[in-house]
Design a protein with these regions (language model features):
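Acidic, glycine-rich two-metal-ion catalytic cores of nucleic acid-processing enzymes
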Residues: 207-311
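N-terminal leader/targeting and assembly helices and adjacent pre-domain segments
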Residues: 1-209, 299-351
Length: 351
């Protein structure tokens, strides 16, 4: 027997639609960061071979001066760095050379930065391409939910490309791409240097950096979900402005993974012009799955039918008040229910 339509199912489908872009974006971020890591590994191995790292104590190698081939490699990498960062990095390189401070340890740190910054343009282009589709989807879905809530339909104008770009830039621009990569600069260079100081051979030094890819895969998933949620939220806001919506209702997903902060905000009404991401507008935190719906005029809302919710534990569909929130769900259908029926989790616990 097919499950009856349910209010929160609509919300979950909306969020799932946006998050369908999460895997492609996360994979793209992982691919790009892996390229930076592989570049650093290759550059460091070349340095170690030229400097005969295996034939001397690591401290002596690290404090030795970087050779001309390393400097030439830095110049080549610098060409791929976004122009806004190029001059500052080059001044740092030439300053260290002029003052005889370009040791191998400093060269490793500089190569880590150059390899990470050399992929920023690719990261920005790839992310913008995916988020543009999320922004368009979010605009139309925000409008569709408004039509569904009011029971009225109208022709929807296409969102202009310039507005899409504004939305995307507000969520993820070049400084955001740099913010994403900067921890990798520090982490990867420290990993290389510490591995050398421990006396590891070149192969093990390379593997220690390669192991960072696993941590970055997790981070890429979190970043992808967060920026997608924020993009969809900004697109909803664009739809609200377009159609004269002055207030919105914060809407959380009803399941056991919803955090207490989002649960408390569920159903609360906020003025559109006072929306603040992370305060009263999603995403509230990394991996946030919340969204918003337009606040309908109270007189119109009073004429509308109640919402329906299907209890997963019993399969029974109930009519619920339109102001039924996460706390009500938690106590009535969720883990806090006291009617003798066991709550049916939506997610399996990991061992």
């Amino acid at each position: 027997m097919a499950k009856a339509p349910s209010w929160n199912d609509d919300i979950e489908r909306e969020v799932a639609s946006y998050q369908g872009n999460m895997t492609p974006l996360a994979k793209s971020l992982s691919r790009i960061t892996n390229r930076a890591i592989d570049g650093l590994i290759s550059d460091v191995r070349a340095m170690m071979e030229r400097g005969r790292y295996a034939d001397q104590p690591a401290a002596i190698f690290l404090n030795g001066f970087a050779d001309s081939a390393t400097i030439i490699r830095m110049q080549a990498l610098l060409k791929a760095v976004p122009e806004r960062y190029r001059e500052t990095i080059w001044k740092s390189i030439t300053g260290q050379i002029a003052h005889h401070r370009m040791t191998n340890i400093r060269a490793i740190r500089t190569l880590a930065r150059l390899n990470c910054y050399a992929v920023l343009d690719d990261m920005l282009y790839t992310t913008a391409r995916i988020l543009s589709e999320v922004a368009k989807d979010g605009y139309y879905r925000g409008t569709f939910v408004l039509q569904k809530e009011t029971g009225m339909g109208w022709a929807v104008d296409a969102i202009k490309g310039g507005r899409v770009q504004v939305i995307v830039d507000s969520v993820f621009d070049m400084p955001d791409a740099r913010r994403y990569m900067d921890p990798l600069v520090d982490f990867s260079s420290k990993t290389v240097i510490n591995s050398m100081l421990r006396g590891l051979p070149p192969d093990m030094v390379s593997k220690s950096v390669d192991d960072i890819k696993g941590a970055m895969r997790f981070r890429s998933k979190r970043e992808a979900r967060t920026v997608i949620t924020e993009t969809a939220g900004e697109a909803h806001m664009e739809a609200y402005k377009k159609h004269g919506v002055e207030q919105y209702v914060f809407t959380a997903t009803w399941d056991e993974r919803t955090c207490p902060v989002c649960g408390r905000l569920d159903g609360q009404v906020f003025d559109r012009d006072k929306a603040q991401v992370g305060v009263n507008y999603p995403p509230m935190h990394p991996n946030c799955r919340c969204t918003t719906v337009a606040k309908i005029d109270p007189e119109l809302e009073a004429l509308m039918r109640q919402r329906r919710y299907t209890d997963d534990a019993t399969g029974v569909t109930h009519e619920i008040p339109r102001n039924f929130g996460y706390k009500d769900w938690y106590d009535t259908f969720g883990p806090g229910r006291k009617d003798g029926v066991a709550y049916k989790p939506k997610f399996k616990k990991k061992d």
